[in-house]
Amino acid sequence: MPIISSFAKKLGFCLILLAGPFSFGLSTPLLAYPFATIVLDAATGEKLYGQNSNTKLHPASLTKMMTLYLTFREVEEGRLRLDQRVLISKNASREPPSKFGYKVGQKVSIRFLIRAAAIRSANDAATALGEAISGSEAEFANYMTRAARSMGMDSTTFKNANGLTASAHLSTARDMALLGRRLIYDFPEYYHLFGRSSVVSLGRTLYNTNRKFLASYSGADGIKTGFTSAAGFNLAASAKRGNKRVVAVVFGSGSVKLRTRRMTELLNIGFAKASSSSRQNRLPPLKLSKSDDLNDFES
């Protein structure tokens, strides 16, 4: 027994050494998932800190940020209306949880689908939005990937509208931070939705999957949680204090509690380093058509 105890202590000490400390005070648990972080100055786009931020990982429901971005774009450009009702397909109705629970043939307005996807992280709502925009989820995934390329998200490929694990459906912490920044500045009239603790959709109160973090971190007003067994617990977040706004992404946490702690540490780093200037570097217009060839962005 003493020999076993001594060996266990030595093994534990070696694992601690191998784990190593993160710089800037980030917590240091042994990692169950591939892990990545980044924090940007939202006004300038400057990277303030990051680990493995260009590593391709599973984005899980952070995917819905792009689904919603393109939905907002379709509404703004007049191709969709918020009160427009769309037919729920068999494909959308069969999506696994988390979901709203729409029935095949049910008609649901774009407004309510947006609320369910953004707040409840409903997979069926995200799929229905993609089908409403592009006719099929596969075509919409191609549209999402083209949009990613146009935004400079060079390491992202989408295969569905909701983020369920699929071969080659991958992104990076950097790319998702760029997308978060786009949501904030391209659609301020819709971005506020991500900061709400709850919404009503079809007579049901939907609670924000991110509400505990929003309540716990001063200035936090978004953006999106994500989880799958392949990804771990992901979070894209933004917060504003005074003239400073930062955007941060965490991939691969082992629990909600750990994700919250890491994001808190990351945003604190961001606010310590971000510029106090309120001047925002203008984002270039998104040049994108649903008919564009993906190869045009990869040449």
Question: Which positions does each model-derived feature cover?
Answer:
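Active-site-adjacent loops and short helices of periplasmic peptidoglycan-processing enzymes
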Residues: 21, 25-174, 184
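Hydrophobic alpha-helical segments, especially transmembrane helices
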Residues: 10-11, 65, 241
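Short alpha-helical segments used as structural interaction elements across diverse proteins
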Residues: 6-7, 61, 256-259
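Alpha-helical protein-protein interaction elements
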Residues: 14-16, 41, 61, 150, ...
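N-terminal start-of-chain detector that recognizes signal peptides
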Residues: 9-10, 59-60, 86-89, 149, ...
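Domain-terminus/edge residues, biased toward the C-terminal soluble/receptor-binding domains
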Residues: 153-157, 165-170, 174-299
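N-terminal secretory targeting signals
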Residues: 1-36, 40-43, 48, 79-81, ...
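Enrichment for repetitive, rod-forming helical segments
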Residues: 16-17, 71, 266-269
